[in-house]
């Protein structure tokens, strides 16, 4: 997805299981080893029909994909990466392995991180202007 919202999707011929992809308005979704060919369409609809911050919309897309069948096998991991205007991720949340729902774990982490995200950007760009978090060493 470029800065104008244009999308492009490519996967090689060796994709495993059910593979499909779809482009939406300022979004794209695709996957392999899917339980159903409609999973990416559900993800695009989840993204496009959700208002709010990009993280909220991406999590809604992941949840919509899961509700549409998700992966053919058990889901153990998920991640959320948001890149903004700087040379580092605005948000990078991961769940590398769980027996529970990793999308729920990402959503819970986003709920905690989202209100603080801009403060971390401020801390990186101009630490003296950043709010104090009240942790040892940050009085």
Which stretches of residues belong to each language-model region?
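N-terminal nucleophile
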Residues: 1-139
């Amino acid at each position: 997805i470029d800065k104008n919202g244009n999308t492009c999707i490519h996967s090689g011929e060796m994709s495993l299981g059910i593979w499909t992809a779809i482009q939406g308005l300022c979004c794209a979704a695709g996957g392999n080893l899917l339980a159903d060919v409609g999973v990416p369409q559900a993800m695009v609809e989840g993204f496009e029909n959700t208002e709010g911050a990009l993280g909220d919309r991406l999590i809604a897309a992941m949840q919509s994909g899961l509700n549409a069948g998700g992966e053919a096998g058990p889901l153990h991991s998920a991640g959320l990466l948001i890149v903004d205007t700087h040379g580092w991720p605005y948000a990078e949340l991961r769940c590398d392995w769980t027996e529970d729902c990793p999308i729920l774990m990402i959503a819970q982490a986003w709920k905690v991180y989202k209100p603080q995200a801009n403060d971390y950007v401020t801390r990186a760009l101009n630490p003296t202007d950043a709010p104090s978090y009240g942790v040892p060493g940050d009085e």
